[in-house]
Amino acid sequence: MIIVLSPAKSLDYETPAHVESYTKPAFVDDASELIDGLRKLSPQDIATLMDISDPLARLNFQRYADWSPTFTPANAKQAVLAFNGDVYEGFDAKSLSSTDLDYAQQHVRVLSGLYGLLRPLDLLQPYRLEMGTRFANARGKDLYAFWGDRITRALNEQLETRSGAARVLVNCASTEYFKSVKPKLLAAPVITPVFEDWKGGRYKIISFHAKRARGLMARFVVENRITDPNALKEFATEGYAFDAAASNDSTYVYRRRVGE
């Protein structure tokens, strides 16, 4: 089983990492190519391209300037400890043991606009480059064209080491990021968990809660060493419960009612 997550815009380089082990990202050469292109942009270009504030554009202009193809604990941090958004509050990697993180290293992947595909312990230098950014490059009009089938092939290399029910991809990424994966070329079926909360008289996806729940699901897989997708139906963290009637073989729906 491989579970894929989206990255986070918010980053934490202040909190010291509680583990020393780390690995190097697989697509450093590709990331370097993107950085070379990003360095040609002015802060105003970055603000316009990414629809961000001038201070944030200046911050990322400097990040691109500082970025190095050499990764060390001095200039980078393990990805799953550096990302700090809703998904990663749910995953809460800083409270996982080194043994748990070793398991996550084999079963969790993070999709990234700059780095393509990251393992949890891959070193990450600070950046901002969302997968949906229409950043024209030598390979095409945007990052989907840039990555092509590279991410899918990298996932297949991992999936092909699994067998039976364990050869499955669990999609806990956003639509924007999972578009970088080509399901028809995958060497495994895809299961997408969907998290819904009761609000306004019906169940609906509430972005903040759904993002957090994706991280909780990834943690559930890691802590329980899950390899069989049927075991995902036992997920019941923070009030969610699997709804068989609303689910099918490729979409697992989890619902909850809070405060009723």
UniProtKB/Swiss-Prot annotation:
One GO CC term, this protein: cytosol
GO biological process: response to hydroperoxide
InterPro entries xref list: YaaA
Domain of life: Bacteria
Disulfide bonds, paired cysteine numbers: none
Family to which this protein belongs: Belongs to the UPF0246 family.
Protein name: UPF0246 protein Bcen2424_2223
Origin species: Burkholderia cenocepacia (strain HI2424)
